[in-house]
Amino acid sequence: QRRYLVSRVSLNGHIDTRGVSDLHIKTGEFGGTMVGNGIEADCEIDFKEKNLPSIVSVTAKGVIPSSMGLGDDIHDKMTLTASGRGPLPHLICEGTVTMPELHVPALDFYDVKGDIHYDDGAMTFSDVKARVYGGIVTARGDYNVDSRVYHIYLHGEGLDSRIPTKEPRFYCLVTLDGEIHCDGNVKDLVAFGSFSSGGGFYSLIPFRGITGTFHNRYRALDFYDVTIDTDFGLIHTDAFHIIDGKLHLGKIELVDKESGESMSITDARDRKGPGRVISQIREDIKEIKERVSGLTP
């Protein structure tokens, strides 16, 4: 059941219970099914007809996503603007959602804007776009006001690895595909997907690309099947985890491209084949330094 507690309500307009009424409503802070800073609405209601056909435009400002079950402890505020028509109890509306910024685990969104469609408690989001780590993320999804079940699908391109890792020595542009699902209980929220990148470098050591998958449930972020393609071999790990902000690293292997042989990085130090990684790294650094020293301003 939807419930709202509204403060500082201002209502003015023309009321005709035998004809058409025009109302303008403005409120202060509100709570209940949804929490926010204020609502402003214009409404035209035809009392002559059955089901009270209406034309409505409404703006809800400062809406807190967590109050709608959209994430845990997310307080970045959004604005919902919509207009529609139909029987007053069952309006169908079209509108937009905007947020200056949105911070969720592992992702920081800026200038969020997208389209919404509302029909009897069911809300769909489409063509949602935002800036994330120097790139662009697009999204679509659906949300039910009553059950708080939602599904979100994301695609990101051109995400700069230096920004989320806070590591200027690690650079590549990442492409991301992900999904977020919630059954109505925010503690059961699940996010998963895959990522890949083009060429980049770490501490002046170049690599051809990175691929992997991720899974996030509540405060545990897991990465699986992560592979870094380098000139001297494939660096691979089945899993590493970030739990409550702490990194837990799984076994890291080096795979020789020619033989397919794999071994731990520690074992590779004293062996031929994949073991040439150490000497190759040193040669790469030496070569890069020589090239840099030969450049003129």
Model-predicted regions and their roles:
Residues 1-224, 233-297:
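Membrane-proximal interfacial segments on either side of biological membranes
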Residues 226-228:
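Active-site/pore-lining binding-face segments in mid-to-C-terminal subdomains
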